[in-house]
């Protein structure tokens, strides 16, 4: 096996861009991010099929990325991405949910003859950090198979795990979460949601002594 630094041109993303027409992709990932999907969207269009194993206890907020994905969220394309991703999954993918947590991820590419050509394992979840697009906090270990024997071993692990699970498309937590993000929110809900976000955790700001000093009638201020 070879270790991947997941920086520069030695990233999981670069390995997955080897997708060609007729390739299949199998993913077992602790997390799934819309922005990881966006980074591979064009390549994924060439897949003939995809299999995805996700943890059923993964928080749905992970779909919108982590702190490092703030600039991507600010592009305000999450709703469109959710629709596109859901359409892609319903069209060619099968999804299975694992009741336990996944502590490492496995990604396997197979050619048109269904032979594994690329296989990765380790801290390579289907997120921007896992693909090497954004920095990842802490240390991680990602391995890529360098021989057909090594790739076949990871492929067998995925196949055995998959055979023990039941597929959930078109239903399932991931599909439902994507549908929720993609749905149009009623206009009358936006204003109270904004107020709740702005005022949450700010009870002390409405305290009388914070607004005006009860003893003097003057609020102490500072000019910088």
Feature annotation, model-predicted:
Residues 1-222:
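PLD/PLD-like phosphodiesterase catalytic module centered on the HKD motif
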